[in-house]
A protein has these predicted regions:
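Conserved blade-ending motifs and adjacent loop-strand segments that build the rim/top face
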Residues: 213, 328-349
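Surface-exposed loop and turn segments in beta-propeller and other repeat-based domains
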Residues: 69-83, 131-148, 188-209, 253-285, ...
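Bacterial N-terminal signal peptides that target proteins for export
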Residues: 1-9
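Acidic, Gly/Ser/Thr-rich repeat motifs that build Ca2+-stabilized beta-propeller blades
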Residues: 20-170, 218-221, 226-234, 286-324, ...
Length: 372
């Protein structure tokens, strides 16, 4: 499935600084003193939310009660560089299973690490994660501290998608015998589906759904087209939005709009577009350092309808994209005046936008339009 927006791709490469001033929003600080929070997930029935802290703690936040003590039973994480405790997601059947999924950096035997994913049962009193089971390990373990990815998305059809970085080992994103630089697809129990694209490909990892990805930091289901969307960090320039489809190659490091941090070209790169690879849906020439993303699919604030919100770590704001089907038509910014790295963005069951800032004194923010 190709995107009509690609016809006007050069128009999408304009620097973000050329867009209009940030829209006015109202911001409430719900929690201070979060030590590098990474992700949040809403619990049902007004029970608050779960928040991961990069250092390895999972906590519960409730209105009027604040932050809990650390939840017991979280696996040991490799807290180094960009590694640590990463995403959190509730199983689709959480109401009966109480299953909570986590992604995290896991140490290997040689001082390197990779992304691992597993789940446990959240106790009825929300204080313990019981019988934690690891169902996925990124192999081989290659990271010395970079590019873990780690976002978790259930598609509503019985499958879990995991975004995986290439551990700063560029060529591995093209290697089908390695799990670096991939999107993988599992069942809701952690098994490999029989219809994954490379199940019958000799020496390929059967978990792989798509490949050629650098460092995905945000991932979400588009509720209007029912497609998986992913954002990923480019190197120096070339942050992208992609729609990872079955068996397709998204180019890294062969195709990129970025260069090395040194200013030199990426050695493996053959151009911005390369035959046999998928062009991105949207590209930033100047990298915002994209992070968590959320589609606004609520009727609470009509002015936000059909918007996609993406956090930006380097630019320290939230990017707002207007979405029509599988195309992006316009961009704006909010929260830039706060000067905080934005790590995660979620739409709450109440229709408000919830934002985590990635600082040693990180915050949980509740955001709404200034004119509700």
């Amino acid at each position: 499935m190709r995107r009509s927006s690609l016809i006007s791709l050069p128009l999408l490469l304009i620097s973000a600084s050329l867009f209009a001033a940030p829209a006015e929003v109202k911001v409430a600080v719900l929690q201070n003193k979060l030590d590098h929070p990474w992700a949040l997930a809403f619990l049902p029935q007004d029970q608050g939310m779960l928040i991961t802290l990069k250092g390895g703690q999972l906590k519960r936040w409730q209105p009027g009660k604040g932050l809990s003590d650390p939840i017991v039973g979280v696996p040991k994480v490799w807290d180094s560089g960009q590694g640590g405790l990463l995403d959190v997601a509730l199983a689709p059947d959480f109401a009966t299973s109480r299953r909570v999924w986590l992604s995290y950096a896991e140490a290997g035997d040689d001082g390197k690490a990779g992304t691992a994913v597993g789940y446990g049962r959240l106790s009825d009193d929300n204080t313990r994660l019981e019988a934690f089971r690891v169902v996925f390990r990124q192999q081989p373990k290659l990271s010395t501290g970079n590019h873990f990815g780690g976002r978790l998305v259930f598609d509503g059809k019985g499958y879990l998608f995991i975004g995986l970085g290439e551990n700063n080992q560029r060529p591995t994103a093209q290697d089908l015998d390695k799990l670096q630089g991939k999107v993988v697809r599992l069942t809701e129990d952690g098994a490999v589906p029989d219809d994954n694209p490379f199940v019958k490909t000799k020496e390929a990892r059967p978990e792989i759904w798509s490949y050629g990805i650098r460092n995905p930091q945000g991932m979400a289901m588009n509720p209007w087209s029912n497609t998986l969307w992913l954002n990923e960090h480019g190197p120096r320039g070339g942050d992208e939005i992609n729609i990872p489809e079955r068996g397709k190659n998204y180019g890294w490091p062969l195709a990129t709009h970025g260069i090395n941090y040194s200013g030199l070209p990426i050695p493996e790169a053959k151009g911005e577009t390369v035959a046999g690879t998928e062009p991105p849906l949207f590209v930033w020439k100047k990298s915002p350092a994209l992070s968590g993303m959320a589609f606004y699919n609520s009727d609470v604030f009509p002015q936000w309808k059909d918007k996609l919100f993406i956090g930006a770590l380097k630019d320290k704001d939230v990017i707002v994209l207007n979405v029509s089907g599988n195309s992006v038509t316009e961009e704006g910014r909010i929260l830039g005046d706060r000067n905080q790295r934005v790590r995660d963005v979620r739409v709450g069951p109440d229709g408000y936008l919830y934002v985590l800032t990635d600082e040693s004194d990180g915050q949980l923010l509740k955001v709404s339009p200034s004119r509700e």
